[in-house]
Amino acid sequence: MKIPFVSFEKMHDEIKDELTGKFQQVLAKNWFIQGEELAKFEEEYAAYCGVKYCVGVGNGLDALFLPLKAYGIGTGDEVIVPSNTFIATALAVSYTGATPVFVEPTLESFDIDPAGIEEKITDKTKAIMAVHLYGQPAPMDEIMEIAKCHNLKVIEDSAQAHGALYKGKHVGSLGDGAGFSFYPGKNLGALGDAGAFVTNDKELADKVRALGNYGSDYKYHHIYQGNNSRLDEMQAAFLRIKLKNLDRWNANRIETAEKYLAGIRNPEIALPTIMPDTKHVFHIFAIRCARRDELEKFLNEKGIGTNKHYPIPMHLQGAYENLGIKKGELPLAEEISATELSIPMYYGMTEEETGYVIDAINAFK
């Protein structure tokens, strides 16, 4: 049996006619940027997240970079970032001219450790990037309390957590604002690159919108030195269709995760933990194994697709060697990078496929 790491086939088969019909509608209108589909998606996604404002942007990186820029964060400033994350979280900080300050996760949640945040705050610190890694909400109460005490902004990196809940509230509604990626592989994915920023702060939303539209507040009137980062009509239209199905698709992922959690019984494997008062949406089902590379080879030989998220922590990436952080300085992030393995997780996995993965992992010795 061959089981891919990720597959969109069943998801897209279910909505193929809707996607095709919407494509024809947008094509017929001959309006492809900043039109009706974008306005409707922004309204619908803001309502879904439980916030007042949504600004469509070109990708998930811009959804993090633009609010930092809007806050005036730049050269000489520092922003707290977990070291075990996708590099976009750190690049968003770097693009402003500020310095990312890397912090350890906890092995239990994979998310940033609030105690580590406190240790890294200086008089240069301006914000915290709260990443909901793999679909597991970060400990937002603690993070927001720290931010309040030190007068810091909190931007949620919700790129992997569409639909996740923290104490009954959607991620994206908990900090000062949040960036989402709609990269095709996400729980809510476009058919190309796309992203959005959400917030309850009108002034912030307006500035992010202007910065992503060449710094313009209206046509040919430019109040900032901005960028070109806009969610186009076609992707917005596709995302509107997918948003209607997101909760159902997430429920299916959670069912698959529950089967994994109940069925994997190998003493060499550490399973993910669902933290209290959260709804984990399992963008990634991340296991850990001291013999990770051997396990990966074993599973791949059985036709099971895998991935690593992420094999090199941010502080050891060549892009950040200028920070001078040595191997061993952030040991928990390094341990996760050395032991984490992501196994198949996508909408529509069958009982047979899930069982095959479970049996293969349990057979690893």
Indicate where each model-derived feature is located.
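Glycine-rich phosphate-binding segment of PLP-dependent enzymes
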Residues: K10-F32
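PLP-dependent aminotransferase-like
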Residues: K69-S158, L165, F364
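PLP-dependent aminotransferase class I/II
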Residues: E9, G21, E36-E43, Y48-C54, ...
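Short beta-strand-to-turn element immediately C-terminal to the catalytic PLP-Schiff-base lysine
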Residues: F180-S181, G195-N200, R240
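Structural detector of well-ordered beta-strand residues that form the stable sheet scaffold
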Residues: V55, I80, V101, V154-I155, ...
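Extreme N-terminal starter segment of soluble prokaryotic enzymes
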Residues: M1-F5
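Conserved active-site segment immediately N-terminal to the catalytic lysine
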Residues: E156-L191, Y218-I223
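Phosphate-binding glycine-rich loop
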Residues: W31-E78, A92-T96, F102-E104, K169
